[in-house]
């Protein structure tokens, strides 16, 4: 199979398994956990998700920079990096920088995360019951955080197919562990052991597959240093602002709907957004899988090949999104009144609400793709518009929640895309013209 299709297929397989495994867990949890255990099950995941704020987009920077440094290198049949000495030393020094950064972040962030969990458990007077599973889960989350950053480094070296295949195997392994644990009635420990064992398996798989490269880079880094902090920190500051803006732009809707219209409608928002973002992620595979190539072509200044690749993949992404929602519309048209389908559809927002959200994410495919293209130049040009958009959407969503029906809850997001699309394109066009002189 051609490498580009391997990347797409492996990424699709991994994402598709996540779409399947979620409902499997949703079916098993109510049968094998008490309501209290179910609550702490999701609490563990929510607290561990604070690690997202320890990353703040750093893993994206890792992928970009490793791709730039790998542009003039290759991996030989024996599993070693080949290239000029200067290129080898530079990518090796960057790898060492990433490891040191991870060590410092993990030593601060994860003790804080563990303490947050302990505070919740102590407040609820269940510390003696849930402390051990929480510590096991937190340790697994720490290993997983480390893994994800290293995987970003390797994906930058154009290893997406192998990495996504490994992620799929680990995700499948994790689902089996959790399902087996629930069936064996070890309750919340099944989640904890699933996280620890799957993340440990990923850790050992990484170093088994890429151990020679890791040893080679670590050895090379001892005799060469490069001021990566000076180059990365200015960009990272803008990434932080973009990350925080994006968090408010896409994560505020369920709690705000809950605030204004109650649990029933917040549930509808949650499940509708899950469906729409799943379609977006499937369509975005065509852009995600060429991210390393975009960075490498920019490093080589091969603008013609870059633009041809980007244009073709963006078209595939847009067509895929339209095709997915076309299939959904046909299915609803013919089966909306069939058997249990009405009961399922009643859990979602109205067709008007879904349509607004679907259109917004269609525009997001453009904006996200332009951002990937421009960020490949080691720049973050959308940080300022991101902040303005986040404030705009937050305020208008507050007004919509208070004054309009739930069907129009996403009107603030829609209005942002109406003015945001041309602004984003102008930034893309102007920066591309400036940087490709």
Residue ranges and their predicted role:
Residues 1-4, 188-195, 204-250, 301-304, ...:
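Interhelical loop/hinge segments that connect adjacent transmembrane helices in multipass membrane
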Residues 3-68, 72, 237-263, 274-277, ...:
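Signature of the first transmembrane helix
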Residues 56-85, 280-301, 376:
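Helix-loop junctions and terminal segments of transmembrane helices
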């Amino acid at each position: 199979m051609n490498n580009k299709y391997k990347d797409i297929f492996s990424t699709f397989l991994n994402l598709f398994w996540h779409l399947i495994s979620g409902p499997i867990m949703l079916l098993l949890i109510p049968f094998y956990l008490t309501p209290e255990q179910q609550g702490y099950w999701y609490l563990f995941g929510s607290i561990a998700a604070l690690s997202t704020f320890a990353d703040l987009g750093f893993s994206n920077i890792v992928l970009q920079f490793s791709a730039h440094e790998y542009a003039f290198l290759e991996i030989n049949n024996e599993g070693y990096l080949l290239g000029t000495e200067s290129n080898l030393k530079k990518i090796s020094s960057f790898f060492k920088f990433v490891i040191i950064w991870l060590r410092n972040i993990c030593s601060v962030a994860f003790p804080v995360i563990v303490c947050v969990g302990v505070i919740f458990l102590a407040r609820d007077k269940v510390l003696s019951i849930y402390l051990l599973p929480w510590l096991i889960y937190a340790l697994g989350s720490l290993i997983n955080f480390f893994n994800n950053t290293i995987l970003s480094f390797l994906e930058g070296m154009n290893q997406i197919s192998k990495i996504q295949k490994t992620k799929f195997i680990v995700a499948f392994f994790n689902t089996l562990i959790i399902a087996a644990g629930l069936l064996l009635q070890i309750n919340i420990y099944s989640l904890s052991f699933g996280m620890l064992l799957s993340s440990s398996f990923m850790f050992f798989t990484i170093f088994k597959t890429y151990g020679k490269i890791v040893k080679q880079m670590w050895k090379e880094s001892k005799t060469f240093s490069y001021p990566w902090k000076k180059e990365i920190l200015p960009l990272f500051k803008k990434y932080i602002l973009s990350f925080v803006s994006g968090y408010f732009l896409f994560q505020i809707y369920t709690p705000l709907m809950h605030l204004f219209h109650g649990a029933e409608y917040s549930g509808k928002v949650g499940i509708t957004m899950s469906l729409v973002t799943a379609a977006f992620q499937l369509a975005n595979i065509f852009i995600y899988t060429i991210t390393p190539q975009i960075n490498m072509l920019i490093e080589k200044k091969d603008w013609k090949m870059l633009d041809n690749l980007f244009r073709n993949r963006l078209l595939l992404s847009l067509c895929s999104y339209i095709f997915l929602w076309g299939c959904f519309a046909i299915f609803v048209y013919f089966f909306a009144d069939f058997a249990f389908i009405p009961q399922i559809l009643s859990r979602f927002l109205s067709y008007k609400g879904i349509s607004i959200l679907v259109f917004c994410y269609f525009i997001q495919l453009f904006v996200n793709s332009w951002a990937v293209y421009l960020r490949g130049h080691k720049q973050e040009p959308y940080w300022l518009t991101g902040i303005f958009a986040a404030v705009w959407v937050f305020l208008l969503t507050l007004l919509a929640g208070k004054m309009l029906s739930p069907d129009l809850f996403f009107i603030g997001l829609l209005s942002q895309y109406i003015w945001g699309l041309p602004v984003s394109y102008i930034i893309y066009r102007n920066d591309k013209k400036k940087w490709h002189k």
